[in-house]
């Protein structure tokens, strides 16, 4: 089975990083995650992430370096998660396509209920704290 390609962004503000909460009724409904979404056919990962963040949060971002690649063998469909550091270029994040959003500190990230594909990123960020945070906006 082919893996589902997904792009996510790490967006920071000071010592906090942006997380979003999935809508109720969605897969992993009301779980927290790093904002992003599926990469459509023929779409480049960075373009997909820019599109998803515009749709879901109303922001335009500069997609920077690749922070982490995670493969998670989900029961229903394997997931290939590409996580990029991002910087907001325009707009203020609003929960347009998500249940809610929150800016969290390093010590808070480990306590969030996240989908399994996000666990390696969650652990890395909480373990390394602000040292591994994305470049400041």
PLM feature spans:
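Generic C-terminal helix-cap and adjacent flexible tail
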Residues: 1, 126-137
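Conserved N-terminal beta-strand and adjoining loop/helix that marks the start
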Residues: 1-17, 38, 69
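Conserved hydrophobic "DFG−1" position in protein kinase catalytic cores
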Residues: 11-12, 19, 86-88, 103
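Conserved Nudix-box catalytic region and its N-terminal flanking loop in Nudix hydrolases
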Residues: 16-55
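Short secondary-structure junctions
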Residues: 56-63
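Active-site-adjacent beta-strand/loop module that shapes the phosphate/pyrophosphate-binding cleft
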Residues: 60, 70-93, 102
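NUDIX/MutT-family hydrolases
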Residues: 85, 94-125
């Amino acid at each position: 089975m082919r893996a589902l390609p997904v792009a996510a962004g790490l967006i920071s503000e000071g010592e906090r990083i942006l997380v979003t909460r999935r809508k109720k009724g969605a897969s992993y409904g009301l779980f927290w995650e790093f904002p992003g979404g599926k990469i459509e056919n023929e779409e480049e990962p960075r373009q997909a992430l820019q599109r998803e963040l515009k749709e879901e949060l109303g922001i335009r971002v500069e997609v920077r370096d690749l922070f982490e690649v995670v493969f998670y063998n989900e029961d229903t469909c394997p997931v290939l998660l590409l996580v990029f550091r991002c910087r907001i270029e325009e707009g203020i994040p609003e929960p347009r396509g998500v249940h809610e959003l929150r800016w969290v500190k390093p010590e808070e990230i480990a306590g969030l209920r996240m989908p399994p594909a996000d666990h390696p990123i969650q652990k890395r960020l909480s373990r390394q704290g602000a040292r591994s945070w994305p470049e400041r906006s």
